[in-house]
Amino acid sequence: MLVGCFEPKGKPLDLEQLPEDFAFGLLPEDWEHLEPILANALHRVPELEQIGMKMLLNGPESFTPDDRFLLGESPELRGFFLGCGMCSVGIATGGGAGRVLAEWVLSGEPSMDLWPVDVRRFALAQNTLRTLRERAPETLALHYAVGFPGRQHQTARNLRLSPLHSRLEAAGAEFGVRMGWERPRWFNPEKRPTAPN
């Protein structure tokens, strides 16, 4: 029997600790991190306690800051195309992603609108190790969550603030983020409780 999971709070990898040639490798077993998930699995399938565990397979996944993969030409390096960050949907989307990426390489543009997965959707401020390390656990936790419209990430915020930010904040602005910019979504001067993001 196989038990798999996406933990509610992921552990970002420390890239400095990985060997340069690390590819398709596994990470050390981390039973302590798995324990809450294992407890839920045992609750759902009590027979697992008698069966026992043979091994814990712990491998890295690639999550982007918004949980959508990256396709397209790198804005930093002309002629360098990316098709990555697919986490667990790579098997399901690989064929179609490969096809449109090949079209893009050959004809200079994709045959359909790919903005939701276009690599250019991120600003440079969103592409720092600190920002990615902060956002990765939240992105993993939301991978199978209900995708409510307008949901805003709580981590890696205040990357880019306009000169008016403090005045807007004083006026009761409730902020959301687009391409790293904090911007008012609505104003709530009395600071009444609002629905969670």
Regions inferred by a protein language model and the residue ranges of each:
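Short, glycine-/Ser/Thr-/acidic-enriched flexible segments
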Residues: 8-9, 76, 87-89, 182-183, ...
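Hydrophobic alpha-helical scaffolding
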Residues: 20, 24-31, 87-91, 154-158
